[in-house]
A protein has these predicted regions:
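Secondary-structure end/capping motifs
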Residues: 219-295
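N-terminal secretory signal peptides that target proteins for export/translocation
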Residues: 1-2
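Sec/Tat signal peptide C-region and signal peptidase I cleavage site
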Residues: 16-20
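Bacterial N-terminal signal peptides
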Residues: 5-15
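Hinge/cleft segment of the Venus flytrap/periplasmic-binding protein
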Residues: 292, 297-307
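Pocket-lining segment of extracytoplasmic ligand-binding domains
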Residues: 82, 161-251
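Short, glycine-/small- and polar/acidic-enriched structural segments
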Residues: 22-158, 163-168, 172-180, 195-196, ...
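Short helix-capping segments at alpha-helix termini
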Residues: 46-49, 145-150, 189-191, 221, ...
Length: 307
């Protein structure tokens, strides 16, 4: 009888639903096609299938989410590889947990009809940015190739308003503009833009968007489940881009426009196919680049940058 009771109790426990783990995820920007694997994983129930209840948060300040993660006030954030190197230099307890976009997207964007035709033309100009630290670091490298330093330009924080501030003449160039988004945004507004691609002007190639967690979460198994969901969502997008676009705009109907359709198509080839794969060599090269340019004080052990 006792064995029967215990067996029934075990079956009842197995039948009871397991409470999903709540995970807060801070984005780097407002929702856009760069975040497609996250949105698709959410809409297809891929997070829920793995016992995760993911709260996706768009920031009011794009520099805020990684610091909230470091402070233990958020579980995970979408961030940038260059920013992670600098944040570790500051002593923030952040670790790479996966890759979302595996190529550079960032560029120095100028008006095609404007006065900046080469990097040396930036002397005396105003450069807009949205995230302090990482973008100013990249500007330093670009200016160096043009024979300039930060003292030769004026850096202006324009927050979200990258292409609008350029089109209005508030600034002469912007850093942090994504080649898959702002170029199209300007064209649709009737203004042609031109990008100086970082990786063609002395900056080593890097992962544009990554997931970061705090060190105390390094061994958390939910991170593996999260990244598995991202990998599956990415494959779904590649296999059925039109069907997944329909699902994406069903969740965010305000994004169903020409700008986002173009950005969706331009972004798909740049998603990390193996988001849990860490390219140590790439991180070593970028850390060396930052040190050579005086942006970090000493070489970083890249194994300590990852979970």
């Amino acid at each position: 009888m006792m064995k029967y009771v215990m067996a029934m109790a075990s079956l009842l426990l197995m039948a009871m639903p397991v409470k999903a783990q709540d995970i807060s995820l801070g984005l780097d920007w407002f929702v856009n096609p760069d975040h497609a694997p996250i949105i698709i994983a959410q809409e297809l129930g891929l997070f829920a299938d793995r016992g995760l209840n993911v709260d996706i948060v768009a920031p009011s300040d794009p520099s805020e989410p990684p610091r909230l993660v470091a402070a233990g006030r958020m579980d995970m954030a979408v961030s940038y590889q260059p920013q992670l190197h600098l944040q570790r230099e500051e002593g923030l307890p952040l670790l790479w947990a996966g890759t979302l976009i595996a190529t550079p997207l960032n560029c120095m964007l100028v008006r095609a009809d404007g006065p900046v035709e080469s990097l040396s033309d930036l002397k005396g100009r105003r450069i807009g940015y949205s995230v302090s630290g990482v973008e100013q670091a990249l500007v330093t490298a670009l200016l160096k190739e043009g024979g300039l330093t930060l003292d030769d330009v004026t850096m202006t924080n324009v927050n979200w308003s990258l292409s609008p501030s350029l089109m209005s003449g508030q600034v002469d160039a912007v850093i942090g503009a994504f080649r898959n988004f702002e170029l199209t945004q300007m064209r649709l507004e009737g203004v042609e833009g031109r990008c100086f691609f970082l990786e063609e002007h002395g900056v080593p190639s890097y992962d544009e968007l990554i997931f970061v967690v705090r060190e105390a979460q390094a061994e958390a198994t939910w991170i593996d489940e999260f990244m598995d969901a991202i990998a599956e969502a990415t494959q779904r997008i590649i296999n059925d881009p039109d069907g997944m676009w329909d699902l994406y705009v069903k969740a965010y109907p305000e994004l169903d426009d020409e700008l986002n359709i173009n950005a969706w198509r331009d972004t798909i080839p740049r998603f990390a196919l193996r988001p849990s794969a860490f390219d140590a060599r790439r991180y070593e090269q970028f850390a060396a680049f930052l040190m050579e340019n005086g942006l970090i004080d000493e070489a970083q052990d890249v194994d300590k940058l990852r979970r």
